[in-house]
Amino acid sequence: MTDRVGLLLGLDLTEVGRVAEVLERHGERFLARVFREGEIRRSRRHPRAFAEHVAGRFAAKEAAMKALGTGWRAVAFRDIEIGRDPSGKPLIAFHGRALDRSRALGVLSAEVTITHTRDLAAAVVALVVPA
C-alpha cells in the first residue's frame, strides 16, 4: 500500500524594477530585514544581475509564505532561507516561525524553483505533506 501525500503550493511573481528601486532607496537595511547573511553573500556574487537575483529570492520567500498558508505577518522573511546545492539547484530551509509552521503541517519535503528575466522574477514552492 502506498502512503498518500498532499501538495501545498505557493507562487509569486515579482517585478525586478520594484526590487531595484527598493535596493536603491533602502539598500543594506532592506537586505538585512529580508535575507540571512549567506543569502546576501550569495547574491553579491552576481553584481551584473544583483537586482534580478534578489528579486528571485524575494519571490521564493513570498511563494513559501503562501505555501505555508501564513502570509508575511505570521512568518518573517528571514525565517525562510533560499540556498543552492552544488549543482546550482535552489534549496529552501525553514527557521523560527516558518519551521514551527512547517512542522505543524507535517511537511515531509520542500522544493523551490526560481526563474527571472531582466523585468520579472517568479518562484514556485511545493511542500509535500501527509494527505
Question: What name fits each language-model region?
Answer:
Residues M1-A131:
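Core catalytic alpha/beta fold that binds nucleotide/phospho-ligands
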